[in-house]
Each structure stands twice: as C-alpha cells, then as structure tokens.
Amino acid sequence: MLKNIIKQVWNQRRQNGWILLELIIAGFFLWTVIDPVYVLTVNHFTPKGYEEDGRYVLRFGAYGEKHGMRDTTVTKEQQRTAIDNMLRLVRDCPEVESALLVQNSSFPNGGSWNGTTYYADTLKSEERKYVNTQEYTFNNAGGGNLFKTYGMKNALTGGDIEVPQDAGGRNLIYVSENFARHMFGTTDAVGKKVYDYRDRAHEIAAVFKDYKHRDFEPIYPLIIRVNNKVGVGPYMHWTYMIAFNLKKGVDEDAFVERFEKEVAPNMAMANFFYDRLLSFDKQRTTWAKQSGTY
C-alpha cells in the first residue's frame, strides 16, 4: 500500500511540484500582506489608553560649550531652578489645565524607548517569573500627575489615578493591565510587589488601562515610575520635556501662536531656550508616515 502511494506521488511529481509552489506563494502572500493588514486593522481599533486632544510636549534646547550665547558662569543649581521656572511659565498659562516634567521616552509616539525587566520575586532561579516592559518616568513636583495630563484611567474603577506626593520616595509604581496579566495572571494587582534588576521592591499603587506607546504597534507592557528629583547634567535638555494639556474649548492654533510669541522668549535662561511644541496628534501622524502605516 505504502509503495503504491509513493509510486503515485512520484509519477505525479510535476503536478505535485506546482501545487507545492502554489502553497508557498500563497503562504508568502498571507505572511507579507494579509498578516500585516490584519495586525494594523486590529491595532487601529484598539483603544490608545490616553487622550490626544490638546496634549503637547515642549522641547527645550541648550547652548553648547562653544556657542557664543553660552554663559560659562551658570551653576547646576541655576539650571535646576531654570527647569522649575520653565515649568511654572507653562503652568501659569490660562489655557493650560496641567503640566509636569517627563523624561524624553515618556510620551506617546515619541522617538525614544526605555525598556527594562521586572521580576515577581528575588529568587535566582530559572523559574523566576519576569516581564520585559517599557518604562515611563515623570516628576510629580508641584502636583504633577502624568495620568491626569495624558487622560489615562484606572483599569479597575475607570476613574482618575491619584499620585501621592511621596510616591517616588516610597518606590510606588503604576502598571498597565498588560503588565499585570503577564506577571500575575490578573489585573487585580494593587498592593503587590515587583522587583527591579537590583532586587529593589516596588509596590503597585494602581493598574491603568492598556496604553499604546506607538499607534501603529501592538500594546506592550508598561510601568510608570515617579521621581521627585531632577537630575542635573550636560544633557538635561535631551533628558527632560514638559508635558501639558489644555483646558477644554481652547483654540489650539491660537494658543500655539500666543505661546510662541509671548511665553517662549521668556524661557531663555541658564543656557536653556525654547525649541518647539509637539502635539500628540501630529506626533502620531509623523511616526505613522515614517513607519509607512499612514
């Protein structure tokens, strides 16, 4: 019986070869065309996890060591004060609802990505459970709250997420639904602890709704850390940005025009200067075009 089957297959090898070639072509088409379209379509209809309207990040620059405008007498403390003053200038705008200092990898569709690994315990074994995750960091000085500024919500209650002023000192962290499910198998993770690569414990203060860092990519685990200190160094203007959201009903074009005319010039201090505003929606469009998914 087996010999007859083998003989039949061999006698029809040319026909079978064409069938195999057709299957290979069809599989290649499904892999290169249908699968990406399916992924992009599903991803398009997946909630972002944040609000875009009226959300901006402000980038500032710094004069280099050889620049003619650089003041060589500026101290680190003056630079730290300058960052606080620039943040205050944004917060004092009547159109602005809230503003805070974030690291440059901590806003949607940004050009940077900060990845790390968190563990379920401190046991050094092959069975040690871990999650590779993206990490956002923001400064909560003066009541800064990334969740309110970005419009992110509590996954369990659907409400706002409050951030205690001492959250950074207590090593509190905030995790996405995706992270909680990967680590614990449930989103009911408030009060549980996870450990960083140095085995430092971090208590989960809240679980927020899944969040897309880049609009054209699937959702990835995300944790958000709070820092109540501003590190001072030669690359501060690359490390930090000011994120803010406008009050409802504000004319965004009119705001940007007024801001760049009246507020931005006042940000020239301690070798820093205003660079530009990036709106969340335009930033998303820019990255979509660069990725070829627009």
Residue ranges and their predicted role:
Residues I34-K124:
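Membrane-proximal extracellular/periplasmic loop immediately following the first transmembrane helix
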